[in-house]
């Protein structure tokens, strides 16, 4: 059965840490290299990849280096209203 409930913050945190680690590895960057390029401390990167904990500023700096900063542009954008019926589409 499909669930339309939003993900929990904990689940989102878990998914983000996994995706960011995978992206770092795909770009063949070590944690140390990412730390230097992003200006985020090595300790912060290690904590993020293990627990998902990171400041928003650091997350965005890492996203810039990992070429996914643009993915954050759609966050909290107002969505268009969905039609209530097929007649509303016509």
Where are these regions (language model features)?
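Short, charged recognition helix plus adjacent turn
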Residues: 2, 73-90
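Short, basic-rich loop-to-helix N-cap that marks the start of a DNA-contacting helix
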Residues: 51-64
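Short alpha-helical DNA-recognition segment
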Residues: 28-46
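A short, Lys/Arg-rich alpha-helix, primarily the initiator
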Residues: 2-26
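Residues that mark the N-terminal boundary/hinge immediately upstream of a DNA-recognition element
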Residues: 19, 30, 55-58
